Amino acid sequence: MSLYILGVPGNIGGASTKMAHLIRLLHKDFKITVVVPEIGFVKDKQLKRLLETYAIPALMLKDLPKKLDGVALAICDRHFFSSGAAREVKTRGLRLVWSNEMMFGFQGEAEAAKEGLIDRVLFVSEFQANKFADMYRGVPAFQTGNYIDPDDYAWRQRRDPIFTLGRLSRDDPQKYPLDFPVFYEELGLKEVRYRVMAWSKEVGRQYRWHRFGPEWELLSANKEPAREFLYSLDLFLYPIGHRIKESWGRAVVEAMLTGCVPVVPAGHQFHKLLVHGESGFICQEYREYKACVRELYANHPFRRKISRQCAEHARARLCDPEAHRRTWLEALSF
């Protein structure tokens, strides 16, 4: 069967990385074509290298034949409906499978669901599915989870003499709690480094009341590859702003695979991703965060043990390629 993946697979950003990993996972099961939004992407060296490995063509939507048979998969493209791309996909005769990935709808998405343009909607979690229950009432739905190629995030022992904690997320001020810098600093750790990606002027304005000292490293989006950034951290300390609910937690699982121990808040999907005290820590209040972090800081053998267990849990329970392959074959079958 023919599968048309709409977007730009790569290693920058969650949706692009997911598409790249799905190509590796499914290239033997589907005749894949990548449909890029702009002609310049066809010449992108990284994309060309990925697609040439699997003999996959890249075209623009306007260059596809007027009549096609197969499935179109679009992932987290905020302009997919407002640009008219969804309607154009349908006029060519393709079944449209859509995965939003977020906890909010994009412009034109609700109208497309109501009109019947979407043949199947995918969700990464039950939590996300419940959020969109009204919008997608009557639309066939499937829960896929989120596939991360575990070989891209191999476990690595940390050897930096300076204890480093940090976080990785998109540069949205709402992703950060209002007390973010104080949250880190009041842990009371000595000889520590804080690394944050992604940071922006807009995020910085939210904390203009705080003076960031030399122990802070605030990186713009994609300043480093996600994997290399995570290798630089001992702990993935991830307090989240009160206005945000996580649909899944891709960066948390990437951190686990590398051996970066996650310390995360309750009330999201993280209890589905890790076992508290074994493959990470889920905290209800600041005192719990402080106790967990200080123990991991002071007890290196314990930290190394949890680091190993994080990676093993993520690889076996969350990122098993064959299990995900079966899931996606079902999700894309009509």
Language-model segments: residues:
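Extended catalytic core of nucleotide-activated donor transferases of GT-like folds
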Residues: 4-6, 24, 33-36, 41-119, ...
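Nucleotide-sugar-dependent
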Residues: 13, 175, 238-253, 265-272
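A short, glycine/small-residue-rich beta-strand->loop->alpha-helix junction that serves as a flexible
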Residues: 6-20, 173-175
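Donor nucleotide-sugar binding/catalytic pocket of nucleotide-sugar-dependent glycosyltransferases
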Residues: 117-154
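Conserved catalytic-core segment of nucleotide-activated headgroup transferases in glycan assembly
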Residues: 149-224
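A charged, aromatic-enriched C-terminal amphipathic alpha-helix characteristic of glycosyltransferases
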Residues: 14, 284-287, 298-334
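Conserved donor-binding/catalytic loop of nucleotide-activated donor transferases
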Residues: 231-233, 251-261, 265-266, 276
